[in-house]
């Protein structure tokens, strides 16, 4: 930049600021935009010490629930900031209650926005469910599959996007009853996405769990999801309570039928960033990497197959 010395001091300062700003933006874009063929892991506090030393190269991004991190200070807060400055992060909320009959908690959404801004996180998703009525419930309840609920939920989604100044991504959830349903789950999910014009976090394990519990064809449900709206994927393990009752726990290894459904998803919808969820019975990182590397392998297999088909 020797040529800068030939310019007026005020022009030098302006250009240097521009170079700095461009570099900062490129840095943010680099560590916050994993490619389509990428695999992430849900970050938990017990992982901080290890990952602040070194993050395995197989982990392309992390995901956190902002509610668990946005008031965190001290050592954990410093470690978290260190990681968000160096690695890509997605946020997946727990308590927005997008389908609630109560007014939207705009103060809470503003707090989410501040957290996202502070850590340069652009991806924010939530559950297509609700967890508040006359008070806060400590579980995610299914929104009634009705036309009125579609319109109500879509209106709230647009409110959230206006506050966040970011696209809002909705996840298909596991559920165990559907009172008052006027349409199927897949029809409801598609209707909300269309009405709100928003993206989908497609949870492959939830499709499998619901297909067993409600006796529908998981492959048909998967095929009915809108490819162009898929932002990224979740995959996890679950607990088999009975042969016809699965519980979405994120506390076990992924089983073969769910792996098969993930491969079908890549074949039907293409490869998307895929996050491994593990919330309970968390094994050592070496064990988690077995599943992370399995996802990488399935992504590469799908990309290879797509390349062959394009050349045929």
Residue ranges and their predicted role:
Residues 48-49, 66-76, 97-107, 177-182, ...:
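Acidic-and-aromatic substrate-binding clefts and catalytic sites of carbohydrate-active enzymes
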Residues 105-200:
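Active-site acidic/histidine proton-transfer and metal-coordination neighborhood
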Residues 26-114:
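N-terminal pre-domain/capping segments
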Residues 161-245:
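Acidic/histidine-rich catalytic cores of soluble enzymes
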Residues 53-56, 75-91, 107-122, 161-162, ...:
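Acidic (Asp/Glu)-rich catalytic clusters
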Residues 62, 124, 203, 233, ...:
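Conserved, mostly hydrophobic/aromatic
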Residues 73, 103, 140-150, 211-269:
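Gly/Pro-rich active-site loop or hairpin
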Residues 11-25:
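Short, Lys/Arg-enriched N-terminal segments with co-localized hydrophobic residues
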């Amino acid at each position: 930049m020797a040529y800068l010395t030939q310019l007026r001091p005020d022009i030098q300062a302006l250009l240097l600021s521009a170079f700095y700003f461009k570099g900062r933006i490129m840095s943010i874009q680099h560590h916050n935009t994993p490619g389509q063929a990428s695999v992430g892991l849900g970050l938990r506090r017990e992982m901080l010490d290890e990952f602040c030393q070194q993050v395995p190269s197989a982990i392309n991004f992390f995901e956190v629930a902002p509610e668990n991190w946005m008031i965190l200070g001290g050592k954990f807060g410093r470690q978290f900031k260190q990681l968000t400055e160096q690695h890509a992060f997605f946020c997946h909320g727990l308590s927005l209650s997008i389908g609630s009959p109560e007014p939207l908690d705009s103060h809470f959404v503003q707090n989410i926005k501040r957290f996202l801004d502070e850590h340069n996180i652009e991806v924010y998703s939530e559950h297509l469910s609700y967890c508040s009525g006359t008070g806060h419930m400590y579980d995610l309840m299914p929104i009634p599959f009705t036309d009125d609920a579609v319109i109500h939920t879509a209106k709230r989604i647009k409110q959230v996007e206006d506050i966040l100044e970011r696209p809002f991504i909705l996840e298909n959830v596991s559920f165990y009853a559907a009172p008052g349903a006027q349409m199927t789950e897949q029809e409801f999910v598609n209707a909300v996405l269309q009405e709100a014009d928003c993206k989908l976090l497609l949870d492959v394990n939830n499709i499998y769990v619901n297909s067993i519990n409600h006796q529908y064809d998981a492959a048909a449900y998967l095929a009915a999801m809108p490819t162009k709206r898929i932002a990224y994927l979740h995959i996890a393990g679950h607990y088999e309570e009975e042969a016809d009752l699965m519980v979405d726990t994120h506390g076990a290894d992924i089983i073969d039928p769910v792996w098969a459904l993930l491969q079908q998803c890549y074949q039907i919808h293409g490869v998307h960033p895929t996050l491994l969820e593990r919330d309970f019975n968390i094994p050592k990182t070496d064990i988690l990497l077995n599943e992370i590397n399995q996802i990488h392998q399935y992504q590469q297999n799908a990309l290879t197959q797509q390349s062959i088909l394009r050349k045929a």
